[in-house]
Design a protein with these regions (language model features):
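Bacterial N-terminal signal peptides
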Residues: 6-15
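Predominantly soluble domains enriched in secretory-pathway, periplasmic, or organellar proteins
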Residues: 17-345
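Positively charged n-region of N-terminal signal peptides that target proteins for export
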Residues: 1-5
Length: 345
C-alpha cells in the first residue's frame, strides 16, 4: 500500500479515535507520587511486588529512583549512571539489574540499594531488555551508541540471572533498536528494529536470528509485545503514529490503528483483552495512554485516549496489583510525578 493510502487510513482512524473520549475510562487516576528534584525524561520501570517498591530509571537525571508505593514517597535516588535505561528485578535474590548508556549493566541489592557488580557488554550502549522466566535468562539490547546504520553489527546480550554473568550474544544487523518481545509458549524473541524498519525474529534455543519481517507501511517500530493466545504481535510505531497488529506466525499484517505521538511503552492485558500504549516522548506538548480492546484476533477498537502530562511515555502494567503506572517529566515548574492508575473492568 502506498504512503498516500496509509495516510488516508490514518486520517479516517483519527476521526473515530478522538470521538471516544466521553466513554467510561478503563483507567482511573487514584494518586500521584511527587518526585521532587528529578529532571528530564524517564525510560523504564521494574517492580518488587512483595515489598511494593518501584525502581524507575530517570535517564536524564542520571539516577534510578526507589519509590515506596505503600508510603507514596520516593525513598532514594541511586546515582553512578551515565544514563540509566532499563531495569529488571529478581525476587529470588532480592536484587535488580540496570542497563547503562556506556554499555554496562549494574547489579544492586534491593534492601541496601548498594552496588554489587558491574559488567561490561560487547558494545558501548545497553538499552531495553526482556526476561525469559522458563530459563531465567535475560536478553539485553546491546548496540553501538548513536548509530542509525541498518548494517551496523548489534547484539542481544544473554545474562544468566542466577549469577548475573554475561554468557553470550545473539548477533543481528541494525544500530537503532528499542525493545524486544518474548514468545511465552515458544522459543522466539521479536526485535523492534528501527534502523531496518522490520521485526527481527530470534530463536532463543539456537541463539540466532532466523527471520525478519519488513514493515509494509511507513513508520519506525519502537515498542513491541505479544498476545500468545491469539498469536498476535502488537507494535507501536512513530512517524506516523500507529499501532500495528501482526500475525506472529507469519509476520502478515492484520490491522493498524492510530495512536498518540511519541509512543515508547506497550503492554498487553490478557485478562481484559486490552493493549495500553503510553506516548509523549521528548518535546510532545502532551502525553497520553491509548487503550485498545481486542474484539477477536483480527479485530480491535480504540476505547480511550487518556491525557497524562507532558513527556509521559514511560509506563508499567502490573495486573497483580490492578495498577498501571505512568512517569511524568518535570515541566514548566511542576515537579515530576509517578501517576498511579486503577485498572477498571
Amino acid at each position: 500500500m502506498s504512503r498516500r493510502m496509509w495516510l488516508a487510513v490514518l486520517i479516517l482512524g483519527l476521526s473515530t479515535y478522538w470521538a471516544r473520549g466521553d466513554e467510561k475510562s478503563p483507567l482511573t487516576l487514584v494518586k500521584s507520587i511527587p518526585l521532587p528534584g528529578v529532571e528530564g525524561r524517564f525510560d523504564h520501570f521494574a517492580i518488587d511486588l512483595s515489598g511494593q517498591n518501584i525502581f524507575l530509571t530517570a535517564e536524564e537525571d542520571h539516577h534510578v529512583l526507589a519509590i515506596d508505593l505503600k508510603k507514596g514517597v520516593m525513598t532514594k535516588k541511586i546515582g553512578g549512571f551515565v544514563k540509566a535505561h532499563a531495569v529488571f528485578y529478581r525476587p529470588a535474590s532480592k536484587e535488580f539489574l540496570v542497563t547503562d548508556d556506556n554499555g554496562t549493566y549494574k547489579i544492586f541489592d534491593k534492601n541496601s540499594l548498594e552496588l554489587r557488580k558491574t559488567v561490561q557488554l560487547t558494545l558501548n550502549y545497553a538499552d531495553g531488555l526482556r526476561y525469559d522466566p522458563k530459563t531465567e535468562l535475560l536478553y539485553i539490547v546491546n548496540v553501538p551508541k548513536g548509530s542509525e546504520n541498518p548494517e551496523e553489527q548489534s547484539y542481544l546480550a544473554i545474562v544468566n540471572t542466577k549469577t548475573w554473568e554475561h554468557i553470550g550474544d545473539i548477533p543481528f544487523k541494525g544500530g537503532h533498536i528499542e525493545e524486544v518481545a518474548i514468545e511465552p509458549s515458544g522459543s522466539r524473541l521479536f526485535i523492534a528494529n528501527g534502523s531496518r524498519r522490520e521485526i527481527g525474529v530470534v530463536d532463543r534455543n539456537k541463539r540466532a536470528l532466523v527471520g525478519a519481517w519488513p514493515l509494509t507501511m511507513p513508520g519506525i517500530p519502537y515498542a513491541v509485545v505479544m498476545d500468545d493466545a491469539t498469536h498476535r504481535l502488537f507494535v507501536a510505531l512513530r512517524r506516523p503514529e500507529l499501532l500495528v497488529v501482526l500475525n506472529s506466525d507469519t509476520g502478515a499484517l492484520v490491522t493498524t490503528l492510530p495512536t498518540a505521538a511519541g509512543a515508547d511503552d506497550i503492554f498487553w492485558d490478557a485478562a481484559r483483552k486490552r493493549i495500553y500504549v503510553s506516548a509523549g516522548v521528548g518535546n510532545q506538548p502532551e502525553g497520553y495512554v491509548s487503550v485498545y480492546h481486542q474484539i477477536d484476533a483480527d479485530h480491535y477498537e480504540t476505547v480511550a485516549k487518556i491525557p497524562t502530562g507532558s513527556s509521559s511515555a514511560t509506563s508499567l502494567l502490573t495486573p497483580e496489583l490492578n495498577n498501571y503506572f505512568v512517569a511524568v517529566q518535570r515541566k514548566q515548574g511542576k515537579e515530576a510525578e509517578l501517576q498511579v492508575y486503577k485498572i477498571n473492568p
